[in-house]
């Protein structure tokens, strides 16, 4: 099978339309118009902080679970190191919006964000291997695009500065590298029709999770 062609097909048919739907959601439509409430922006900061903490724990579990496999151990170690500062970057954004440390300490994940974190942990613990990277490819492609949107319109409409927006400027660059790495791993791993189906399902599920996450934040922080 042509793994590279399959990856490109998934990007064209699933990931890119998913990004378009996210950008057309009411969360980002209101962001561009300058009408998105500070409360809903704070909601993203809190929920993404909690999600990033869960990701770190997932990668730590992946390191332990795969200690016998040097390649996978190295992979989870790399991911852990890459993500280690991200909870604090999300928190920094929230603090710039007026949140306090106790807001993060007292917070719990909303249902839709629990689903996102659970999917990440599921992929780590069930040993999905390279095929499960379709979730990461999709998620990080969407993060990269929405980081551009946040970076542009939080400056334009909300007057935030470089320091407050560090999370987004980092992800505009880093996630391009991460998506390229995921695409390469997936392309090498796809060998059978079932593999292709798993890749497409992982991408489709992550689009649904991401769309649900932002709608959930919009509603929970009304």
Language-model-detected regions and their locations in the chain:
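Non-heme di-metal
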Residues: 1-222
């Amino acid at each position: 099978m042509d793994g590279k062609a399959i990856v490109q097909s998934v990007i064209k048919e699933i990931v890119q339309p998913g990004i378009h739907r996210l950008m057309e959601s009411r969360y980002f439509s209101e962001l561009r118009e300058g009408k998105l409430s500070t409360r809903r922006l704070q909601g993203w900061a809190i929920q993404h902080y909690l999600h990033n903490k869960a990701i770190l724990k997932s990668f730590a579990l992946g390191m332990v679970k795969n200690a016998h496999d040097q390649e996978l151990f190295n992979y989870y170690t790399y991911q852990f190191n890459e993500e280690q500062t991200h909870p604090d970057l999300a928190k920094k954004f929230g603090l710039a919006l007026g949140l306090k440390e106790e807001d993060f300490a007292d917070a719990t994940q909303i249902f839709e964000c629990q689903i996102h974190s659970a999917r990440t942990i599921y992929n780590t613990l069930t040993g999905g291997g390279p095929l499960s990277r379709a979730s990461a490819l999709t998620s990080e492609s969407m993060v990269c695009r929405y980081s551009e949107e946040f970076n542009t319109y939080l400056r334009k409409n909300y007057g935030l500065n470089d320091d407050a927006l560090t999370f987004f400027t980092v992800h505009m660059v880093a996630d391009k590298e991460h998506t390229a790495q995921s695409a390469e791993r997936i392309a090498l791993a796809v060998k059978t029709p079932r593999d292709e189906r798993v890749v497409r399902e992982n991408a489709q599920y992550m689009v649904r999770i991401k769309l649900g996450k932002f709608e959930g934040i919009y509603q929970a922080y009304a």
